[in-house]
């Protein structure tokens, strides 16, 4: 569904998949995106070659962010061979990524693709949005915008049509929203600041 349904008619869903580092299939996932090692039958090309000619050429786990989940076992000195191979793969292909979940958060392995939200509940949902700081003139306006945007996200979460009953139950239980901040560089440029923290920005954010 995520590969084909367009959000708002213009944006494809972001996909995320992860696996525990101790899973029996972990070595297969580690190398799943080595497309240069996967030949196309009847040709001398690999899938990576085909992707260079046609970005939309189908490839395993294409359009999905993948990660390995590391927990207390890794933290206590185990799974070093897997971790080092993960580092090697990430340097070669950019994936898999790394997900670290320790102690009382060890089961929070579920994420949305950009990982603003973490959860341990199957079928969890979240409603995300961003405030463009560059379009706001005063700290008072910023406060009002954050307040209204948070309300908007809550209302959207409540009103959203959900695919099945379990999602609705988890939504009522957790009610997750995430309000991000963008446009900070433009905000700084408009005020002739360098791209760094300053007292004015600190005052706005506090």
PLM-predicted stretches and their roles:
Residues 1, 5, 89-176, 181-191:
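Function-dense linear segments that define catalytic or interfacial modules
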Residues 4-107, 181-206:
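Conserved, charged catalytic cores of large soluble enzymes
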């Amino acid at each position: 569904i995520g590969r084909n349904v367009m959000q708002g008619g213009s944006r494809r869903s972001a996909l995320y998949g992860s696996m525990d580092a101790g899973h029996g299939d972990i070595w297969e996932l580690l190398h799943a995106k080595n497309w240069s090692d996967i030949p196309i039958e009847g040709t001398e090309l690999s899938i990576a070659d085909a992707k260079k000619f046609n970005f939309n050429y189908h490839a395993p786990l294409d359009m999905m962010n993948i990660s390995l989940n590391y927990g207390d076992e890794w933290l206590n000195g185990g799974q070093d061979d897997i971790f080092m191979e993960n580092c090697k793969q990430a340097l070669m292909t950019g994936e898999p990524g790394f997900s670290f979940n320790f102690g009382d958060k060890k089961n929070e392995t579920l994420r949305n693709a950009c990982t603003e939200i973490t959860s341990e509940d199957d079928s969890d949902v979240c409603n995300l949005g961003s405030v463009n700081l560059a379009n706001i003139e005063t700290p008072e306006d910023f406060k009002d915008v954050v307040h209204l945007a948070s309300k908007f996200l809550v209302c959207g979460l409540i009103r959203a049509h959900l695919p099945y009953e379990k999602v609705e139950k988890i939504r009522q239980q957790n009610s997750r929203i995430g309000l991000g901040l963008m446009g900070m560089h433009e905000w700084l440029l408009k005020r002739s600041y360098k791209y760094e923290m300053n007292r004015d920005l600190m005052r706005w954010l506090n």
